[in-house]
Amino acid sequence: MSFIDSLATLGQYLPAVTKPKEKPSLGQKLVWSLVAVIIYLIMASTPLYGITSASFFKNLILEQIIFASTTGTLAQLGIGPIITAGLIMQILAGSKLISIDLNDPDDRVKFTEAQKGLAFIFILVESALFGYVLARTSTTINASILFIAGIVIAQLIVATYLILLLDELIQKGWGLGSGVSLFILAGVMKIMFWDMFGIASVSSQNLPIGFFPALFTALASHSDVLNLIVNTSTKNLFQPDLVGLVTTIALIIITIYLTTMTIEIPVTSQKLRGIRRTIPLNFLYVSSIPVIFVAVLGSDIQLFASLASYVSPSASNILNTVSGVFFFPPPNSAIPHSIYAVVLDPLGALEYAVVFIVLSILFGILWVDVAGLDPATQAQQLVEAGIEIPGVRNNPKIIEGILARYIYPLAFFSSIIVGLIAVFATLLGAYGTGIGILLAVTIAIQYYSLLAYERSLEMYPLLKRLIGE
């Protein structure tokens, strides 16, 4: 039995959500999607039993955004195992390391089951790792560490598998889009909402954490509002300010514009001679993948540095030094997370920007090659679909050369652009981080298109017959 067959067999034995017998209406899909989000948000607000704090993972902010996780809660792992399994399977399929034809319905089913099986394995492994670390560092219960770890691990396994089922519920047609996208969007919007409107008072100045409540409180009490324009406080490092708010709005507008830009390649169809159309290549060809990989790499090095402190302090110091270049301001530093940090540490800001953008370019080019987005794969798909480029022989090698003129420059420049968006968001203190903004905008645009599509099908039933639904 092959590797993918073994994973698919495991996936088949796991509890699953069945497909609806009849296609739900748009209203029903919206209700199920809302229910899934509410359950996720409840889990993200429910503390793990046996854990008093989760300060050990407090600095893994970017991972929490990417994986829609919340430290110290039932959503500690979030969608991390699902995304990790999905990326690995996509890389294996795109690089032809596994023999599978995603155009074959049976192989697609096998691929989906294998991905689910791999996600479950990651759930077990990550639950064991995080559960043990949390039990060792974040509890005051008078019991053995192994006993507490067992309780925490059990909670993480059940809760994370429930998140997997919620994702499956939406993907199988009960809801809209995918649960993974929906939970990321909900997580980023939650962070942005609290940065703008949070009323909890956590600062040394006794101001609410949200910008607008803090501004109202400061004006009403005739307090100094300069720190709310640009946060220069070394006591309240994470207080959102006006510069961050303006940056957030500007980056959202820029990201929407860039996300909707396309490069059109004229083509014709062998079946429909004389009819010309175009194939759009997204200007942000690699989407937010490069910055996600950079953020995950930095967070993982930081996590391993923390874990290594129990085994080898010297190794931990080395890893902490390496991970420091992935974050600005550096973790555990007394520098406010605002544009003022650039004034205090300009060399650190420059080092962070250079490292982040260079790695974004490397990951962007690598992703194109391993995920099947390269010119050779795209050319082969065009030939198999009977699509031709006018004035060019229908030869995969020739078409590959033409596509290479577009794809690699797009991959290079889009990697730089998403890297710059992430860097400027960090340096200027944008709400939700640059990666969060990129993910939220991309997902929101996808849902807008999906809602328009579903609405069109309901308004014009004839379209269902034309597209075979």
UniProtKB/Swiss-Prot annotation:
The chain crosses the membrane at residues 21-47, 60-88, 110-131, 147-171, 179-197, 241-262, 288-309, 348-367, 411-429, 433-447. This is Protein translocase subunit SecY. It is a multi-pass membrane protein. Residues 1-20, 89-109, 172-178, 263-287, 368-410, 448-469 are cytoplasmic. GO terms for biological process: SRP-dependent cotranslational protein targeting to membrane, translocation. Belongs to the SecY/SEC61-alpha family. Pfam families: Plug_translocon, SecY. It comes from Saccharolobus solfataricus (strain ATCC 35092 / DSM 1617 / JCM 11322 / P2) (Sulfolobus solfataricus). The keyword Transport applies. Component of the Sec protein translocase complex. Heterotrimer consisting of alpha (SecY), beta (SecG) and gamma (SecE) subunits. The heterotrimers can form oligomers, although 1 heterotrimer is thought to be able to translocate proteins. Interacts with the ribosome. May interact with SecDF, and other proteins may be involved. It comes from the Archaea.
